[in-house]
């Protein structure tokens, strides 16, 4: 959930109550998913995740499949979509890396849909904003691919390798748009740092 000020009054309890009492918490944040420039299959994955439809263990159990429900990356009990992509200790390492990189404090929302709704924060600088908007998609894509590699191929990246994979995807996706003149990954990291 993201509580935004009204245009005239700022933050008021009444506006917060309206956000809390509205069913679904508001409109679907489709611009956070479909208006950001990155590979279409990643956009489809993000859209599916925002709708709560990716095939994690809890969703497969709801469909009648009997399987062990544990999170591959953190080896904890109960693989849900929100746990895997937001709250898993393995995912937390990636999210914390981003928040330190951009020099911000952040409280992770409960659900993926709420994250996309809150992620529309304005960074001020256009190039930083373009990078900022693709980050949740990139992190979730890395985590999903790692989960699938562990589940179906028996391969496992350590957290440092996963962080490097994240940066590689981020740099490649941003370079493919032609919006940036960064010659290497270190230039991108340095530019977005606080």
Identify the meaning behind each predicted range.
Residues 1-194:
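Charged boundary/loop elements
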